[in-house]
Amino acid sequence: MSDLLLLGLIGGLTLLLLLTLLAFAGYSGLLAGVEVSAGSPPIRNVTVAYKFHMGLYGETGRLFTESCSISPKLRSIAVYYDNPHMVPPDKCRCAVGSILSEGEESPSPELIDLYQKFGFKVFSFPAPSHVVTATFPYTTILSIWLATRRVHPALDTYIKERKLCAYPRLEIYQEDQIHFMCPLARQGDFYVPEMKETEWKWRGLVEAIDTQVDGTGADTMSDTSSVSLEVSPGSRETSAATLSPGASSRGWDDGDTRSEHSYSESGASGSSFEELDLEGEGPLGESRLDPGTEPLGTTKWLWEPTAPEKGKE
């Protein structure tokens, strides 16, 4: 009889534990719907304190922790420039930090000095008239993990179906929501100085390769040159990405369904703004945007998940 009671107690505790875990996952956003739309940005122009990172996105957790420890009440922000499935992990670039001010408000000199004391740099991002955006609950650390596996595939599908030129990918942690934002215009204004510097370096390498090829009088580039062009961040296929704060690891691990194309590439025929039904218009948005507002020198991109990546899920 005592054995039956013991087994019943163990079974009851196990069931209670499973129900608790399910409730925790549900509270973290497991069952939350993901709606992607195009419209006004979730934030206005902002001034941020950031640190530039080149390397594994999973190593950015310390940057979130550092920026939050300086001023815990400020919102965290991340701008991911490279697709980790296209660019070598040690070459992926991002900027992580805190939002110091928004709109017409200017950050206090004391706050700027405080962040600069810890090695952060200050930069301002504009408020683009239109963006591709999505939100996800931010209630627990698990919310971050769930968001990277649910929101990014939804963004990929939305952008791919409409052949949009939307990059880089930003994440803003605001109260109990994670806002994902992909600008449809003024993308170059979201490139911090370090990002622009690496872009010019890689672009110079590509131009040097072109010069060498032209010097040989060849009509077409060799296979080696073609590969170099395709994988060079800042040339045809390279630029932008995304992730989060908290103590857990950040970045896109090998298990998600990310495409092999970079953020700054949207295929040869990206759709214009006139072909896009913009939703969620607000005071920050405009009715239509001139498709010619894309920054000079950027290329469009299109997400195309590959079979090997799907097999890793």
UniProtKB/Swiss-Prot annotation:
UniProt short sequence motif LIR motif, positions renumbered to this chain: 273-276
Region (Disordered): 193-313
Key words of the record: Autophagy, Chromosome, Cytoplasm, Cytoplasmic vesicle, DNA damage, DNA repair, Endoplasmic reticulum, Membrane, Nucleus, Phosphoprotein, Transmembrane, Transmembrane helix
Transmembrane parts of this sequence: 7-31
One Gene Ontology term from the biological process aspect of the record: reticulophagy
Positions bearing Phosphoserine: 239, 244
Side of membrane Lumenal, spans: 1-6
Skewed-composition ranges (Basic and acidic residues): 251-263
InterPro entries the record matches: Reg_factor_effector_dom_sf
Effect in UniProt of substituting residue 276 to A: Completely abolishes the interaction with LC3B
Location of this chain's protein in the cell: Endoplasmic reticulum membrane; Cytoplasmic vesicle, Autophagosome; Cytoplasm, Cytosol; Nucleus
Principal location: endoplasmic reticulum
Record GO cellular component, one term: endoplasmic reticulum membrane
Annotated Low complexity bias: 264-273
Gene Ontology molecular-function annotations: signaling receptor activity
Membrane topology term: Single-pass type III membrane protein
Xref: Gene3D superfamilies: Regulatory factor, effector binding domain
Record carries keyword Phosphoprotein: yes
Polar residues bias (residue ranges): 219-247
Quaternary structure and interacting proteins, as annotated: Interacts (via the LIR motif) with ATG8 family proteins MAP1LC3A, MAP1LC3B, GABARAP and GABARAPL1. Interacts with VCP/p97; bridging VCP/p97 to covalent DNA-protein cross-links (DPCs). Interacts with TOP1 (when sumoylated).
Annotated function: Major reticulophagy (also called ER-phagy) receptor that acts independently of other candidate reticulophagy receptors to remodel subdomains of the endoplasmic reticulum into autophagosomes upon nutrient stress, which then fuse with lysosomes for endoplasmic reticulum turnover. The ATG8-containing isolation membrane (IM) cradles a tubular segment of TEX264-positive ER near a three-way junction, allowing the formation of a synapse of 2 juxtaposed membranes with trans interaction between the TEX264 and ATG8 proteins.
Domain notes: The LIR motif in the cytosol-facing C-terminal region is involved in the interaction with ATG8 proteins. The disordered region is required for autophagosome binding and reticulophagy, probably via bridging the long distance between endoplasmic reticulum and autophagosome membranes, because ribosomes exist on endoplasmic reticulum membranes that attach to autophagic membranes.
The protein, known as: Testis-expressed protein 264
Naturally occurring in which organism (per UniProt): Homo sapiens (Human)
